[in-house]
């Protein structure tokens, strides 16, 4: 019957959810949620003095009566709403070359405490395909039956074979859950336990997210590895600097015998001295040949100061 709750009434059920065994906090949460109308089952105690014909078997001072009440309440959480309370409807689809044009997921009952069994939900509608063109199907709808066969109790592979093995025309019995009864498809399942489908989705996302990182790492290795650095001529440039700086020191000090018999690398102390002045200059092979084998007029005049019988003079004339 429909009535108004009175103080002292005992609340037994909210929209079919039995409150027996729930804590006070859980019971309060059941009275909050997105729904505007809720069905309550109350237990009302009727004092014995108000009864006209008391029962002979009544040993208690009052009588308890179950009262069914439909009343408007503020929003309630999804845990207190039956997911199959939404409107049920049938949709007929004809397969094309790509099938029915939608994907589905199986939401295990362990993922949500208020589910009585696994649910098969439509995850995505593909543009231009039969399911999307039908216009009556939406992501998140629950598939209750396929061509009259219930999906309750079926595992994911069985539902898949049921849809793939269906004839050209398929009749789907769908149910659209009340708002807030189940997580939105875009948000996946916000539950502490992972369903089989979510584990598969997470594995797929991990593969797709790590692949670009591997590609970037490979390209980084190709462009910035130590081997590649050597290939860019980093070490030859340092040796060229040493040659330039050693030759510059030779022109300043002119120890002729030692400069012609020793390699430029034998003067490491000259590198530091010349680094600030000649850092931007690149020594070419021609410049090295000129510096090693040719001398200026000043060098010749400087040679005149020495005796022509000296070894340095003989060595210089041999070079010229």
Curated annotation (Swiss-Prot):
Pfam families registered for this protein in UniProt: PDZ
Tagged with keyword Repeat: yes
Domain of life: Eukaryota
Alphabetical UniProt keywords: Repeat
Domain PDZ: 1-46, 90-178
Region annotation (Disordered) ranges: 215-239
Record's protein name: Putative protein FRMPD2-like
């Amino acid at each position: 019957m429909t009535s108004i709750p009175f103080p002292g009434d005992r609340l037994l059920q909210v929209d079919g959810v039995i409150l027996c065994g729930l804590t006070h906090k859980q019971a309060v949460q059941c009275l909050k949620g997105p729904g505007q109308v809720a069905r309550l089952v109350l237990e009302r105690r009727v004092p014995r003095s108000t009864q006209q014909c008391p029962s002979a078997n009544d040993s208690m001072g009052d009588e308890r009566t179950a009262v069914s009440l439909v009343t408007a309440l503020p929003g309630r959480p999804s845990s207190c709403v039956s997911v199959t309370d939404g409107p049920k409807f049938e949709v007929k689809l004809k397969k094309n070359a790509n099938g029915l044009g939608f994907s589905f997921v199986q939401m295990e009952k362990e993922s949500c405490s208020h589910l009585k069994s696994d649910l098969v939900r439509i995850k995505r509608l593909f543009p231009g395909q039969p399911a999307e063109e039908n216009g009556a199907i939406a992501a998140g709808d629950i598939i209750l039956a396929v061509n009259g066969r219930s999906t309750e109790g079926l595992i994911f592979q069985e539902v898949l074979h049921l849809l793939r093995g269906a004839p050209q025309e398929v009749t789907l019995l769908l149910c659209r859950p009340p708002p807030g009864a189940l997580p939105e498809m875009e948000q996946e399942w916000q539950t502490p336990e992972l369903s089989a489908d979510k584990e598969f989705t997470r594995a797929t996302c991990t593969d797709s997210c790590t692949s670009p990182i591997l590609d970037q790492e490979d390209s980084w290795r190709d462009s910035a590895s130590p081997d590649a650095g050597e290939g860019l001529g980093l070490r030859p440039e340092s040796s060229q600097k040493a040659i330039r700086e050693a030759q510059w020191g030779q022109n300043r000090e002119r120890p002729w015998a030692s400069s012609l018999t020793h390699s430029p690398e034998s003067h490491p102390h000259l590198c530091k001295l010349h680094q600030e002045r000649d850092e931007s200059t690149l020594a070419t092979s021609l410049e090295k040949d000129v510096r090693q084998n040719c001398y200026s007029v000043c060098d010749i005049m400087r040679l005149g100061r020495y005796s022509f019988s000296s070894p340095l003079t003989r060595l210089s004339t041999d070079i010229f």
